[in-house]
Curated annotation (Swiss-Prot):
This is Putative 2'-deoxynucleoside 5'-phosphate N-hydrolase 1. InterPro entries: 2'-dNMP_N-hydrolase, DNPH1, Nucleoside_deoxyribTrfase. The keyword 4Fe-4S does not apply. It comes from Thermofilum pendens (strain DSM 2475 / Hrk 5). Belongs to the 2'-deoxynucleoside 5'-phosphate N-hydrolase 1 family. The lineage of its organism: Archaea, Thermoproteota, Thermoprotei, Thermofilales, Thermofilaceae. It comes from the Archaea. Substrate binds at H37, E82, S106, A107, M108. One of its GO terms (biological process) is nucleotide metabolic process.
Amino acid sequence: MKVYLAAPMRGDRSALANVKKLLQALEERGYVVLTKHVADDVLDVEKGMTPREVFERDIRLLEEADVLVAEVSYPSLGVGFEIAYFLLRGKPVIALALRERLESVSAMIRGITWENFRLVAYSDVDEAIEKLDSMLPGSVDMQ
């Protein structure tokens, strides 16, 4: 199964350590993570990619992915776009937010009631991984 892991890139990257652990956990479980770059310390644009190249690559990866896992504890226009893009294609989205940041997550995201969307609060990354284990497509909770 191909996972699009989404996380803030240009804004507040306070959850980066959690994103790195999520990436590692997904790969250890045999998932193909298409967006390993979200866990990089150096941004793609700092490596020379143009915004257009980033957009085109990410759209291609969104189309290829089976499920989107988004870290939404800190605001990101890009992650919001990716979530909407995926949802409108009827694909499953799991949004993860640190419990202490849940009220800071966009009301638009917190208000999604579509069947292919789950917002999951977590206290630490181990809890997030445990919840992901039960929620990824194929499990009872996302069907």
